């Protein structure tokens, strides 16, 4: 029975990290598309838009890093 719990833990970690990565990739893709739309409409605002783009991209990318940290904690500390 212990082996089944460890296997379920591995699956849970894989799903958690995988879904977080997919969500971040979709979010950054949408964000990049909107940045390009904004830059095409208002070329004068590109420096301001670029700064905001990188800040929000960092925040969107932080969620999968937290999920990876929690997944590694679950994988090595709990099992």
UniProtKB/Swiss-Prot annotation:
Keyword field: ATP synthesis, Cell membrane, CF(0), Hydrogen ion transport, Ion transport, Lipid-binding, Membrane, Transmembrane, Transmembrane helix, Transport
Source organism, top-level taxon: Bacteria
Feature type site, description Reversibly protonated during proton transport: 61
InterPro entries according to UniProt: ATP_synth_csu_bac/chlpt (IPR005953), ATP_synth_F0_csu (IPR000454), ATP_synth_F0_csu_DDCD_BS (IPR020537), ATP_synth_F0_csu_sf (IPR038662), ATPase_proteolipid_c-like_dom (IPR002379), F/V-ATP_Csub_sf (IPR035921)
Subcellular localization: Cell membrane
Any one of the GO CC terms: proton-transporting ATP synthase complex
Family: Belongs to the ATPase C chain family.
Assembly mode: F-type ATPases have 2 components, F(1) - the catalytic core - and F(0) - the membrane proton channel. F(1) has five subunits: alpha(3), beta(3), gamma(1), delta(1), epsilon(1). F(0) has three main subunits: a(1), b(2) and c(10-14). The alpha and beta chains form an alternating ring which encloses part of the gamma chain. F(1) is attached to F(0) by a central stalk formed by the gamma and epsilon chains, while a peripheral stalk is formed by the delta and b chains.
Name of protein: ATP synthase subunit c
Source species of the chain: Buchnera aphidicola subsp. Acyrthosiphon pisum (strain APS) (Acyrthosiphon pisum symbiotic bacterium)
């Amino acid at each position: 029975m212990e082996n089944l719990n460890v296997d379920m833990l591995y699956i849970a970690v894989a799903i958690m990290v995988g879904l977080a990565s997919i969500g971040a990739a979709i979010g950054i893709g949408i964000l990049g598309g909107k940045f390009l739309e904004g830059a095409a409409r208002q070329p004068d605002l590109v420096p301001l838009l670029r700064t905001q783009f990188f800040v929000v991209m960092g925040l969107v990318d932080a969620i999968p890093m937290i999920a990876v940290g929690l997944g590694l904690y679950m994988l090595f500390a709990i099992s």
